């Protein structure tokens, strides 16, 4: 999940992103689920609610351009986006699950004509 695959990861223009948020019938193949190997095919809004889950990061530990936390998967973000900046949001997980529900959200930004633009959302979390 933390491993960026430019050849298969989803890339949307701003207009497409807005359109797909409104059209929940359009489904995308996001990859394979860890553990089961089942293919994940869901609409963008469901993907964002389930996998990005922004509300989990309300009390997150935040770092800028620094990997403070990581799971066992190879992190190639700096190889794919060598000149980009990123913000890492780390949710340590809950006591209820002994921290095994930890997750990391990395927002990657590029500068263009003096403004920063979101170019990638990289999600990492505990998996089996």
Task: Put a short name on every predicted segment.
Residues 1-128:
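C-terminal-biased regions
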């Amino acid at each position: 999940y933390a491993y960026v695959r430019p050849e298969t990861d989803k890339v949307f223009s701003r207009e497409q992103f807005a359109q797909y948020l409104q059209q929940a019938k359009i489904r995308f193949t996001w990859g394979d689920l860890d553990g089961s190997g089942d293919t994940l095919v869901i609409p963008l809004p469901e993907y964002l609610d389930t996998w990005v889950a922004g509300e989990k990061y309300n009390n997150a530990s935040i770092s800028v351009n620094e990997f403070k936390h990581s799971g066992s998967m190879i992190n190639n973000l700096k190889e794919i986006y060598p000149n980009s900046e990123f913000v890492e949001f780390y949710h340590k997980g809950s006591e209820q699950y002994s921290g095994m529900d930890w997750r990391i959200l990395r927002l990657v930004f590029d500068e263009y004509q003096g403004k920063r633009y979101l170019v990638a959302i990289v999600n990492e979390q505990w998996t089996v």
